């Protein structure tokens, strides 16, 4: 990595140096902003008060830190925001499974490669190391989506993107297929400026495709009820999935991309590709696993889980959660394909009666069996 030899003290020159370093490290987007309380702090508190965070109690416990990044690093003067493109927007080939053994659960695209947390964090560490070497007295702190920070707000302030109606950060004309990371520093760096191509504050206009595509009704303009979101239900919720969501999971076993795949900005043929870095997907995000066989998953051991998914973001879901999700999807499959219903229901009954199985999985089987009976009534 070329760290450039000239010492830098001017905030504007430092901005150019940091952006060059980050691009050398392969980041598609780089922006800088000054720390400030989030403009959506009141909206976040109202969202929490309404219980739309579901079981994610840690969000309420860290609300003050989330709303003001200065609480994460008191000496912070600048936040460097970086992002990677992890998908080009192309659609998956639809495969219609008729037999239970063919039924598979889809994985959200960000979780199909190696764990993006590591892919982003490792290079932010390199960025920090280069900056610390040049400025040994400066303070730094890395953040990502596991720290209490409204990071999409911060990236919007750094002009990396704009927040869409589905609450994801999207780049106008390029979409929302980006994973984010940040480096907070005590160094004063000139903030980024608004790109000339951004000719509106609202990137969505009258479009409601993401809202219309959400099968659980989780999305309203610029807000998502996490307790109804498929991504939350399959990844964050620890208990059973209620029968009100059966028939709406759309084959997703981990996460959901439905609100992105319909977004006009996310379509590969419509992307502007103004910047090659922004438009291309690095080899580090090569897909390794895009779906899993549902019946086979019900027989997984902890060793199977570790072997197949522990190097990816899939590890966020426990084995019991993955099995729970598979139970729901198998019930949906049985409801659509009557010829498979008897075999799937027999497997679910067997799992429900297995005293060695996790209680949540057994309870989910009972819910699924009752739901299938209601579909026949």
Predicted regions and their residues:
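Accessory, usually C-terminal, subdomains that scaffold auxiliary metal cofactors
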Residues: 203-205, 209, 222-240, 247, ...
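Alpha-helical scaffold domains
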Residues: 243-377
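Flavin-dependent oxidoreductase catalytic cores
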Residues: 194-195, 199-209, 219-221, 315
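Iron-sulfur cluster-binding cysteine motifs and their immediate structural context
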Residues: 27, 209-231, 238, 252-278, ...
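Short, hydrophobic/aromatic alpha-helical segments in well-folded domains
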Residues: 127, 199-203, 215, 248-249, ...
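Short gly/pro-enriched beta-turn/loop segments at secondary-structure junctions
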Residues: 163-164, 172-173, 178, 207-208, ...
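Auxiliary alpha/beta "docking" domains used to position bulky ligands
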Residues: 1-202, 241
